[in-house]
């Protein structure tokens, strides 16, 4: 059983900081003076006077970018000029110069009168190299900072771009495919390709009227696999399958509709599904997981051999993946693999995709002392499901560092399967593994805007902390009420 995705540099750039001379004692004296100067500036603004002078002048916000040698005390000397000219500094950032490796560039957002600013610039010219004056706020844009990083979607609607970059369309069948010589089947596959390629984020997923033969094929797969699930599937799978029968029409005589499944998953775990025309690259497929979006095929395998398919079809997606995507812990595990892939190098994405393959596609877990399957490739393949839980299978403990080196086999049973005690354990191991990924920033999924925020400086991190603080306040309030109720 082939998984839902299988086919397949980023460089470091300088991190931006708030100070280049933070270890110099003289800085603390300067920063103290600057703080005092800012307070004086505020008082003078209230009285309408220009700092240090008797006349009044209109202050306005402006900015300057200058470069200086990366040496101890260099920043202190430059910033002292701002103090001497009574220029109020609102924000400071630093980064390595793109012009000379031995220099750094300083961005200063400030507030002052025109006269003071011109005098400041003249003094700065003697100590620094002026790069630009009064630049736009986005002088150091994220686009510029990420220019050496592989593109990834920053908002959920940009998954349209990922979904349409199909490597192999559903109509391109190999000569050994059961439906290769079936022109009617090939035309049907073309229909599903057109549906998927025409889909855009926010639209309801088109409902498909499956043919009698397609429904019959689905029915055979559903019936035979259902016999194995009680003794082979994990408890999370067994918990959700009856719910899918109740709310999404999982029956032997009915092929479920992706729109119904997507709405069900949204309520259970926050995941949704969207149609896809064929194979995606690992990078594009994993990017969908970062947004809790799973790309699903809608076509059904060829009816001549219902228990075999050389590619992922809707039987694989609906019976293998969906029941576990409805589990919140499994959903979180899936999303974290996706988040780790964003902006990662091709080599790291390959490693993550291999870990995905041997967990979400072919993973095993221990429950009540017994091996159980949670991988979709197993739960949608009768032969391999039996094999993986038999004495003939080679089972190893899941360790991302070694698992990522295991060869992924497509047309035969795997040489090895990997077992975890729980989804939580697998998730923690993947978190530790993700720390080794070469990526000079972290990412945060904002569930309110369904966008990815890049955490690379104190301001971006502060925004996340504010959200966490709000959540913690809610938890603390709930605990206090529980304690009051219990009389603690």
From Swiss-Prot:
Phosphoserine PTM positions: 19
Reaction catalyzed: (6R)-L-erythro-5,6,7,8-tetrahydrobiopterin + L-tryptophan + O2 = 5-hydroxy-L-tryptophan + (4aS,6R)-4a-hydroxy-L-erythro-5,6,7,8-tetrahydrobiopterin
Disulfide bonds: none
EC number: 1.14.16.4
Domain ACT: 63-138
Compositionally biased intervals (Basic and acidic residues): 40-58
Protein name, entry field: Tryptophan 5-hydroxylase 2
Pathway(s): Aromatic compound metabolism; serotonin biosynthesis; serotonin from L-tryptophan: step 1/2
């Amino acid at each position: 059983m082939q998984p839902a995705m299988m086919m397949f540099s980023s460089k470091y750039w300088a991190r931006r900081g708030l100070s280049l001379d933070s270890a110099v004692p003289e800085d603390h004296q300067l920063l103290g003076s600057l703080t005092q100067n800012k307070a004086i500036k505020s008082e003078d603004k209230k009285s309408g006077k220009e700092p240090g002078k008797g006349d009044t002048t209109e202050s306005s916000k402006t900015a300057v970018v200058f470069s200086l040698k990366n040496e101890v005390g260099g920043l202190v000397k430059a910033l002292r000029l701002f103090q001497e000219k009574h220029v109020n500094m609102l924000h400071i950032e630093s980064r390595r110069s793109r012009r000379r490796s031995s220099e750094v560039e300083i961005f200063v957002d400030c507030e002052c009168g025109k006269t003071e600013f011109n005098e400041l610039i003249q003094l700065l010219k003697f100590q620094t190299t002026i790069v630009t004056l009064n630049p736009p706020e986005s002088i150091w844009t994220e686009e510029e900072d990420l220019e050496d990083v592989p593109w990834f979607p920053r908002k959920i609607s940009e998954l349209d771009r990922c979904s349409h970059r199909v490597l192999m369309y559903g109509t391109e069948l190999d000569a050994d495919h059961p439906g290769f010589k079936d022109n009617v089947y090939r035309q049907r596959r073309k229909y599903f390709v057109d549906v998927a390629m025409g889909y855009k984020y926010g639209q309801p997923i088109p409902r498909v009227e499956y043919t009698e033969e397609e429904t019959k094929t689905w029915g055979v797969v559903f019936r035979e696999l259902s016999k194995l699930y009680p003794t082979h599937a994990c408890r999370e799978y067994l918990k959700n399958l009856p719910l899918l029968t109740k709310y999404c029409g999982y029956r032997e005589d009915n092929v479920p509709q992706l729109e119904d499944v997507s709405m069900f998953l949204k309520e259970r775990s926050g995941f949704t599904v969207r149609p896809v025309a064929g194979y995606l690259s690992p990078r594009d497929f994993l990017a969908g997981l970062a947004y809790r979006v799973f790309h699903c095929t809608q076509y059904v395998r060829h009816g001549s051999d219902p228990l075999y398919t050389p590619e992922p079809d809707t039987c694989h997606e609906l019976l293998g993946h969906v029941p576990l995507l409805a589990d919140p812990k499994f959903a979180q595990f899936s999303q974290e693999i996706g988040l780790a892939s964003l902006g990662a190098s091709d080599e790291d994405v390959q490693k993550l995709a291999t870990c995905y393959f041997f967990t979400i596609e072919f993973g095993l877990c221990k429950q009540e002392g017994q091996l159980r399957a949670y991988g979709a490739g197993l739960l949608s393949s009768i032969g391999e499901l039996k094999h993986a839980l038999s004495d003939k299978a080679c089972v190893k403990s899941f360790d991302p560092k070694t698992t990522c080196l295991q060869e992924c086999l497509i047309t035969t049973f795997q040489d090895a399967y990997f077992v975890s005690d729980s989804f939580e354990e697998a998730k923690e191991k993947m978190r530790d593994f993700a720390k080794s990924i070469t990526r000079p920033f972290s990412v945060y999924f904002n569930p309110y805007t369904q966008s990815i925020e890049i955490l690379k400086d104190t301001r971006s991190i502060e925004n996340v902390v504010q959200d966490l603080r709000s959540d913690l306040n809610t938890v603390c309030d709930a605990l206090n009420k529980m304690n009051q109720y219990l009389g603690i």
